[in-house]
């Protein structure tokens, strides 16, 4: 019931964040591939076997983790490109290109995930697939930007 739902969303805490953080640290150390870390917070979420609302909340909680990480990596990359753009006297404005690319990616993610939702004609399964799409695409974009950052720092 509602009480259980309230409890499960409160349990989205440092514990579940630590689950992904530890997984990513292992991945960085070469112990696993970082893609295997996606869904870790969801798996640890008490509501993941509950109602649609509880499941979507669990997915949304993890999406918030990836979204915060995405914003952080994006800002770091903008800073790197801003420095690099000022070092070179060419016409490559990588800050603007990254911004355009990110805007395009957001548009693509929203369209793709809306499709994942609409495919089930707005039913409960659509809410889950739509939310899962947002989570997995956001995590995937984090990895893409982390790779770009690694290259840009060379």
Where are each of the predicted segments found?
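N-terminal alpha-helical modules
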Residues: 5-154
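Bacterial N-terminal signal peptides
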Residues: 1-2
């Amino acid at each position: 019931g509602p009480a259980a739902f309230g409890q499960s969303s409160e349990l989205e805490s440092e514990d579940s964040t630590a689950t992904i953080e530890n997984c990513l640290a292992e991945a960085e150390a070469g112990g696993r591939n970082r893609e295997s870390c996606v869904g870790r917070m969801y798996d640890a979420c008490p509501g993941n076997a509950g109602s649609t609302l509880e499941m979507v909340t669990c997915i949304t909680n993890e999406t918030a983790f990836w979204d915060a990480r995405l914003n952080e990596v994006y800002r770091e990359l903008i800073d790197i490109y801003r420095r690099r753009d000022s070092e070179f006297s060419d016409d490559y404005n990588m800050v603007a290109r990254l911004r355009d690319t990110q805007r395009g990616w957001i548009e693509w993610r929203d369209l793709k995930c809306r499709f994942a939702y609409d495919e089930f004609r707005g039913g409960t399964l659509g809410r889950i697939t739509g939310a899962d799409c947002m989570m997995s695409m956001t995590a995937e974009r984090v990895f893409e930007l982390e790779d770009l950052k690694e290259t840009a720092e060379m």
